[in-house]
């Protein structure tokens, strides 16, 4: 099972290395892989790609998206402050504003320019390319 999880999270080349020798991106993926080892019913990811460089961030987002799309995947709650970090394949979203739930539901009807603009009090354009979101203030 451990080898399969290492392969799923693209960590097979690091199986024999100590944690301290891994890059930040490799460490984040290792921590997530460790969390999925016991086949959880719920996986909570709190800003899993924060502080990663572009390559590590995109690789990790892609892996999380693929994992989330698998039929046997647990329910996943992912906290992020950046729409660009939402993996393709996520189906629902919740927007918080001032410590309260502002909007929640299917991602296509929740992550919209109107709702994001209202939640943040700033005119923001939201669009999606290949099921990945991005936001731009104007």
Predicted regions mapped to residue ranges:
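ABC ATPase nucleotide-binding domains
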Residues: 119-138
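Conserved ABC ATPase "signature" region
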Residues: 1-14
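Catalytic Walker B motif of ABC-type/P-loop ATPase nucleotide-binding domains
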Residues: 43-47
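Conserved catalytic motifs of ABC-family nucleotide-binding domains
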Residues: 39
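H-loop/switch region of ABC-family ATPase nucleotide-binding domains
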Residues: 80-81
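Conserved ABC ATPase signature
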Residues: 18-22, 26
């Amino acid at each position: 099972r451990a080898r399969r999880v290492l392969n799923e999270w693209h960590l097979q080349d690091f199986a024999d290395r100590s944690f301290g020798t891994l890059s930040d991106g490799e460490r984040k993926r290792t921590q997530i892989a460790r969390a999925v080892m016991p086949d959880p019913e719920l996986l909570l990811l709190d800003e899993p790609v924060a502080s990663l460089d572009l390559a590590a961030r995109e690789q990790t987002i892609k892996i999380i998206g693929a994992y989330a799309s698998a039929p046997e995947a647990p329910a996943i709650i992912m906290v992020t402050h950046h729409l660009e970090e939402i993996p393709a394949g996520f189906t629902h979203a919740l927007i918080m504003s001032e410590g309260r739930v502002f909007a929640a539901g299917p991602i296509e009807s929740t992550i919209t320019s109107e709702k994001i603009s209202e939640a943040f009090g700033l005119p923001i354009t939201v669009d999606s390319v290949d099921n990945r979101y991005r936001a731009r203030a104007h």
